[in-house]
Amino acid sequence: MKKNKRTLIFALTLTALSALASCSGGGNSENPDNPGDGGGTTTNSKHQYTATKRVNEYLVKEGRTNYKIVISEESDTQLNYAKNELNTLFGEATGVTFDFVYDTKVTYSDSATYISLGQNAYLTSAGLDKEVSFSTYGRDGARIITQGKSIFIFGATNFGTLYGVYDFLKITLNFECYYEDCYTLDKNVKDLSMYDFNVIDIPDVAYRQRRGLLYPTASQNQMFPYRMRVTDDVNMLFLPIYENGPGSAYNTNHNSFFYFPEKQYKTTDPDFYSVAGNQLCFTARGVPERFEKMTDIAAAKIEESLTFNSVAKAPTYTTAFLGQNDIQDYCSCEACTKVRESHYGSACAPIIIFMNRVGKKVNEWMALPENAPYKRNLNYSFFAYLTTIVPPFKQKADGTFEYSQDIIPDEGVNLMPYVASMNFDYGRPFYSDENKEAREILKTWGNFYPGAWSWTYGGFYNDYITFFDIYSFYEDFHSYLKNYKYSLSFEQVKNDQRGADPGFGGLSNYVLCKKNWDSSLPMDTLINDYITNVYEDAAPAMREMFQKLRLWFAKLIEKHGIGAGGQMQGDISSNAKYYDGIGFINELFDLCDDAYKAIEIYKKDEAKYKRLSTYIDIEWLIPAKVAISCFEAKYLASDFIAMKTKFKDICIELKIKDIKEFTSINSYLESLGV
């Protein structure tokens, strides 16, 4: 097959997701994998927090303010959140709340004292709409500008406005959110200076997938994901593919057999399936007529979903996704083997060729006048995962690519890989030698498809009540995504856990949210800030507990090598070989006891004591799970029953959902017999 050389920037038609990502600066001179090979140059232009206090000018003076909030009469959810969060948190800090006025009722003047939220007529009357390039902000980028005596907080959308409010509160009142019920905020502020703001704050990763604790339970703070600036859910982006028509079962993830249900096609069209029968054959055994029939069926499935989920009904769907089954296998037929061998051994090549053909057919269908209500700028996405992780192209040292022409999409077909990197060792630093090959693969996909999506891991998926050290790996990961222009990141970690996440899951959630937004933030600083502000007087003991767990984990990785791929499936807390006796577990219990003692001074403040003791309870579950599973003989019967009772009570009270991936904790709690 003819090979072509291609420069780094090529003429793929990109969707809005891709365009947003292309605003990112690239490159990192400290990282050995970026010798100027297409990553660009590092810039801090996305995060500028210039704010200078004015002399003898005040937002609040002696507990009073002259300022009002200006908003548009045409509001949306995010703008409502922005005004409510500003008023609520500002009021909590100062005792002052703002009156509201609609933008059509006021006109800008240098002496007017307003805080303007979002794009509105007041911003236009100040002339700022002509001075700002909204296209560079993406969906979430925030801008804060002082002009005259007015402050303008806005973005290209009101997501940016909301995040700008959080920046404003951070600068003026030290607001920082750590956990669903824990944030810092200055209190009893009677005098607050006016600032000259010139703030730009644009996320390094444009779209950030929610996970775990970012899905609050009904009793938790529903603003938590917004305060952490992570609100995306790919289920709101992916068209559902229905097994047997709208209203039937559907899948948006590993959904290839929803496109081609076995009951419908396995007997009549066996060539649609792999030789082993557990995946699709994306070449239909190399028979052109069968390939056309297969792509017709897949296109019809997408068209069916587009029709049922019209733009007016479901505007968030941007992507038609076809995901292989979640197993280490691919079709071994002669035709698929030939395609792989002619595309650098990539099992993803047949999928890309298939999706390009499907995308062309769906685009032609959407272009028909009668289908105007269903027309979207649609991505056609696929997994690069497990056996399909290797790209079907090769990047050369000069930044150009060698590839086969048949993987280049037809005009208007937006192909988008979802790179699910099970091939990393998440227990080791991102720049470790063990992760070199996986880094190269991630970089190559990102360079060939600017705006690609990333799915990563880092957890023991058969054991949710234990500790996994993600911090060395994710220290440098998000800057790599930024450099190579990825537009979405999903760090799975313990994605389906709810209520609470033992193993310092609150901390891991915090640092992942922060690094997604600004990848330059130092990991150690984030860790220390979280522990200091969440645990307060118990911080020294909890910091030592965290450090001991990191040391234990490092030994675990070196001795057992269980931080990579399928090796992350181990049941850790139920296996005594990982602990070398009960001594380490007793050390963790002792540190929890020290932490409980440190907060006894707050017992008269019932709410605060309960909050702090709950944070300690969550991590107490780690040694308790090991002790219950492995060391019953080391305890008096009464002490062992008390331990199991406390374990069960904590899990029930906090509504902890899972004991391991896809498995409720309820059966385990019942098995405790207390």
Language-model features: locations:
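Feature activates predominantly on carbohydrate-active enzymes
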Residues: 77, 82-85, 89, 93, ...
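Aromatic-lined carbohydrate-recognition surfaces of secreted/lumenal glycan-active proteins
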Residues: 355-394, 451-461, 489-492
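Structured mid-domain segments that build the active-site/substrate or prosthetic-cofactor binding neighborhood
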Residues: 282, 286-296, 304-313, 433-552
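Substrate-binding cleft/loops of secretory-pathway carbohydrate-active enzymes
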Residues: 380-422, 465-472, 501-507
